[in-house]
Amino acid sequence: MKTLYSLRRFYPVETLFNGTLSLGGRDQETTGFAWWAGNARLINLSGKLLGAHVAHAGLIVFWAGAMNLFEVAHFVPEKPMYEQGLILLPHLATLGWGVGPGGEVIDTFPYFVSGVLHLISSAVLGFGGIYHALIGPETLEESFPFFGYVWKDKNKMTTILGIHLILLGAGAFLLVFKALYFGGVYDTWAPGGGDVRKITNLTLSPSVIFGYLLRSPFGGEGWIVGVDNLEDIIGGHVWLGSICIFGGIWHILTKPFAWARRAFIWSGEAYLSYSQGALSIFGFTACCFVWFNNTAYPSEFYGPTGPEASQAQAFTFLVRDQRLGANIGSAQGPTGLGKYLMRSPTGEIIFGGETMRFWDLRAPWLEPLRGPNGLDLSKLKKDIQPWQERRSAEYMTHAPLGSLNSVGGVATEINAVNYVSPRSWLSTSHFVLGFFFFVGHLWHAGRARAAAAGFEKGIDRDTEPVLSMTPLN
């Protein structure tokens, strides 16, 4: 493969502890990168880079399969999923596999099948990764020109982008087909308690779907995180899948316009930085989704959201004290506001106390008690059902709180059972990963831009103090 520029010009870092260390033509002398720079040594070896990526995919899928089987092996059907530290089975249950009314697990075999399928897939990917890393051609350009590429080839790069977009679109449509034709998905809002149902009446109105993107990110609006029905979620995936597929076809058939050629840096490291920027946004969005949304992430599987646990506690004590004779409509709390009920700034009747900040929570166990103007006092006095009391007591004691200081009034107990909500795990991990990807995006974008501008020098070693010191040995 012809190299269009001197590697040294772009990768001039020249510090190797052992200058003779050679890695099969992938040493520092030939690539400009030391062993610890990992895949950077493979920038111009498309065959070996393919091996690294396939092997990486194998590791990801192996984790999914192994962890899936680990969760199946440890699963106790009598306990809720969120009490058992599970993060994969809740996703499978949300897709409608193995669960029945109320989110009760009736069959764990689909979970076992999922784990085995992922393990088998990981073996295939692992073999492919090892083959391309060790045996296959170092570069693909000569033998398989369709799979070969030069990083500067703008047309080829947008073709690869298009292929990726089509695959993402197909993934979005897999969820649509599951919800429409293959057994449906779990709907926490199904009448009479959550249940698996086919989503028939999709929301395809662009004003509704794209309206989410224009909403405020705060409060009950919550940008796209505020979606509260499966019709909108599945309809959104129809739109998203269609846009990805048509965008992919567009990028395969067209060449980048002049403004795009000028605006972007066209190098491997630049593409890495763009991808990390996208993954960072995904991570932060997923963090907010799993923390606040109880439709895409049903509380039956993931445990209550923070606001949900807080409102559940207010409801639980309202029920208790009403039974003991309290007049919940007029009792005054220590601040002079209503102890059990008060009014929101816009006049709705809401729960009183510290949970007032979560007044715009919506949850399946609470909505039946609302009227046209917030909570309905007569329903609270006459219509509370035993299942609502049980659900709120359960959620009150399973708040997704670590050692937070501000817990929305939820009673915290230092000697409580060792419980960490999957919402805590998933939102924290995705926030941290989103942040790290953002830092990686800045780092690689800066390096790529500097290299393109021609002043990427690495660290100047000539004036380093260590050079004038006595060797340690």
From Swiss-Prot:
One Pfam family here: PSII
Q: Work out whether the entry's keyword set contains Manganese.
A: yes
Q: How does it sit in the membrane?
A: Multi-pass membrane protein
Q: Where are the Phosphothreonine modifications?
A: T15
Q: What is its main location?
A: plastid
State the oligomer form and interacting partners.
PSII is composed of 1 copy each of membrane proteins PsbA, PsbB, PsbC, PsbD, PsbE, PsbF, PsbH, PsbI, PsbJ, PsbK, PsbL, PsbM, PsbT, PsbX, PsbY, PsbZ, Psb30/Ycf12, at least 3 peripheral proteins of the oxygen-evolving complex and a large number of cofactors. It forms dimeric complexes.
State the protein's name.
Answer: Photosystem II CP43 reaction center protein
Q: Which organism is it from?
A: Angiopteris evecta (Mule's foot fern)
Gene that this sequence comes from: psbC
